[in-house]
Amino acid sequence: KDGMAYRLVPAVLSSPQQNWIVEQAFRQNGLGGTQIRANNLDSMYKTMMNDFEFGGAGKKGVYYDEENRRHILAIRSLYGEAAGNMADAGRKDEAQKLIDKVEAGINPANLPYGLVSRYNSHNQTSMVYLEACYKAEKKEIAEKVRTALRKDLNQQFDYYAALGGMSRAEFDNLFNTY
């Protein structure tokens, strides 16, 4: 991947997704894994830091409909993927710069880290971003993302529990048995 586009060229592939805990967790829970793949880190970093602009996504008070949220979420995910792979390659300074740029470029008040969405894809994407923040040692941002995700997931659980079915204890026990 070069920046935000795939390029078809002969290459020796590595498997950076093996370094991601979220990739393994999604696969174990039948979610099919993530989109994390081998990247041309130098080209991706150059494109994201020098060429890409967020087009006003950092402005306060902007509303995004579901389709626009999906697109902006993909951008946040790509920055997270690049930052996590950079950190795995020992390039934490560059990873931190990527996280800083996306944080400045996408206002979390307009596009929260945790949010109900189709197939819960918003929260899945945020989990990739959360892991990238930890890998890049951006612990303050990681804590904000973790708190928002946990709050949203708990609210979703409470909603579904109110409909009947499993109690919180039964649900927690389900995950503790694995």
Question: Could you tell me what each predicted segment is?
Answer:
Residues 1-178:
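ER/secretory pathway lumenal C-terminal domains and tails of membrane proteins involved
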